[in-house]
C-alpha cells in the first residue's frame, strides 16, 4: 500500500539541526506555508464557490497550525514542483507526497498518516476489453499520467509495453480517458472511488490494487 506522507524541508544539512531551524523560523514568523496541488479529491481540492482549499490534507494542516499557534497559508503548486517548492523555500511543508529515494535525498518525511492502493481506471464500456492490469500492458494501449506524479513512474513499471502519455497540470490524466484519447490511467484507490461517482462512465479495473 502507498503511504501518504507529510513532506518537511530538511534539505542537505543534518536533519535534526535543519528541522529545528525551520521550526523556529515558522514560529518566529507566525505563519506555516503549505504547498498543495488542489487537484486530488478528497485530500486537497479548491472549491470554486469560495476559492478556498478543502479536503483531508487541508484539515490536517489547519489543525497542525492551530497546535503550533500560527496561521496557515496554502500555496498553489504542481506535482512536478511539489518538492522543489520546499527546497527553494517557497513553502515550508507539503502533503500527500509519495516517498521515493530521489525525493528523500533532498527532503525529509514524517511518518505516514494514510495508506492507499493504486488501481487502473478505464471507461466502463471498455471493462470487458480491459479486465485486468495485464490487459492494459499492450503496445496498442495508451496510458495517461499526470506529469510529476508518483503514478507517472509507476506506469512505466506496470505497463512497459504500453504507450505512456504525460499530461501537464492543471489538466489531469483521467480527462484523457474520458475524452477517449487514452485507454486508461492509474491513480490512488481513494481518488478512484471518488472519480467513479463523479464520472459514472469511468470504472475501476477490479483485479486488485498494487503498491
What are these regions (language model features)?
Residues 23, 53-57, 104-116, 204-207:
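A structural signal for short loop-to-beta-strand junctions that line the ligand-binding cleft
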Residues 21-97, 105:
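Extracytoplasmic small-molecule ligand-binding "clamshell" domains
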Residues 71-78, 145, 162-170:
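Short beta-strand-to-loop elements that line the ligand-binding cleft
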Residues 143-159:
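Secondary-structure junction motif
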Residues 124-141:
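Flexible hinge/capping segments at coil-to-helix
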Amino acid at each position: 500500500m502507498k503511504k501518504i506522507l507529510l513532506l518537511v524541508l530538511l534539505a542537505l544539512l543534518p536533519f535534526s539541526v535543519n528541522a529545528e531551524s525551520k521550526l523556529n523560523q515558522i514560529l518566529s514568523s507566525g505563519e506555516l506555508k503549505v504547498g498543495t496541488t488542489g487537484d486530488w479529491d478528497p485530500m486537497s481540492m479548491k472549491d470554486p464557490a469560495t476559492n478556498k482549499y478543502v479536503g483531508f490534507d487541508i484539515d490536517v494542516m489547519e489543525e497542525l497550525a492551530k497546535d503550533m499557534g500560527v496561521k496557515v497559508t496554502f500555496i498553489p503548486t504542481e506535482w512536478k514542483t511539489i518538492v522543489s517548492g520546499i527546497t527553494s523555500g517557497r513553502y515550508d511543508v507539503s502533503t500527500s507526497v509519495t516517498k521515493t529515494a530521489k525525493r528523500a535525498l533532498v527532503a525529509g518525511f514524517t511518518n505516514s498518516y494514510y495508506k492507499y492502493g493504486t488501481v487502473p481506471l478505464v471507461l466502463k464500456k471498455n471493462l470487458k476489453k480491459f479486465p485486468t492490469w495485464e490487459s492494459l500492458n499492450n503496445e496498442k494501449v495508451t496510458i495517461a499520467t499526470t506529469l510529476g506524479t508518483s503514478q507517472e513512474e509507476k506506469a512505466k513499471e506496470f505497463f512497459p509495453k504500453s504507450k505512456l502519455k504525460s499530461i501537464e497540470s492543471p489538466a489531469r490524466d483521467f480527462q484523457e480517458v474520458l475524452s477517449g484519447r487514452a485507454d486508461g490511467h492509474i491513480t490512488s484507490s481513494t481518488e478512484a472511488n471518488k472519480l467513479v461517482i463523479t464520472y459514472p462512465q469511468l470504472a475501476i479495473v477490479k483485479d486488485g490494487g498494487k503498491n
